[in-house]
């Protein structure tokens, strides 16, 4: 996972994970009512998890997921506001299996109490995967795997930079508008004979990304 925005991470720096729930709920109240696209909700949730990992004494992501399941999900359910429900939907989309199950069940109980879902709730976590590409140097030292995906008419792209000189670990990852990102990549490849840019099958992209995730992150 790429490091979170340092301004967000700073919110959690003084806190152990167990005490971060109130801060996350406060951020949710400030932000989630203004998000209208599933991609924005997913990115916000990812940034929060990254901030918790960066800011709460360097806790590992599995520990963060366990703490969110134990403390944040019950706190959000008790709050039972539209923003808290939105937070639960986000956690259900991007969390570990245990967190996903707990957040989804809590969200259903909140909606049963009469709280309305955000307009992106049905789409979050369920994009349609489009074309995939491989971009790298001819020596194979580094490569980027780009996967386009969309919700309805909106198309985005995820690029993951893999460093094979460092054990196939993930060096960086980012999300952008698909058309803009691919245009930039095409231009870079056309101007450099040592760059390879080619389409690959989604199954191939998935296998390469799974290997990179299993290898872990490059040390910062």
Language-model region placement:
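Non-catalytic terminal/accessory regions
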Residues: 1-220
């Amino acid at each position: 996972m790429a490091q979170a925005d340092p301004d967000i991470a700073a919110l959690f720096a003084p806190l152990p994970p167990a005490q971060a729930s109130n801060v996350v709920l406060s951020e949710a109240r400030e932000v989630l009512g203004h998000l209208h696209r599933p991609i924005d909700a997913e990115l916000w949730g990812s940034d929060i998890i990254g901030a918790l990992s960066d800011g709460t004494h360097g806790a590992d992501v599995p520990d963060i997921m366990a703490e969110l399941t134990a403390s944040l999900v019950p706190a959000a359910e008790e709050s039972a506001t539209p923003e808290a429900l939105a937070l639960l939907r986000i956690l259900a989309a991007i969390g570990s299996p245990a967190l996903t199950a707990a957040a989804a069940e809590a969200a259903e109980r909140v909606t049963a109490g009469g709280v309305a879902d955000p307009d992106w709730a049905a789409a979050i976590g369920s994009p349609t995967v489009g074309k995939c590409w491989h971009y790298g140097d001819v020596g194979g030292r580094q490569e980027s795997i780009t996967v386009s995906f969309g919700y309805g008419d909106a198309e985005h792209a995820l690029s993951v930079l893999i460093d094979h000189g460092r054990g196939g670990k993930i060096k960086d990852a980012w999300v952008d508008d698909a058309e803009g990102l691919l245009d930039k990549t095409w231009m870079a490849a056309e101007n450099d004979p040592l760059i390879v840019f080619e389409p690959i099958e989604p199954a191939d992209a998935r296998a390469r990304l799974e290997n990179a995730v299993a290898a872990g992150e490059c040390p910062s």
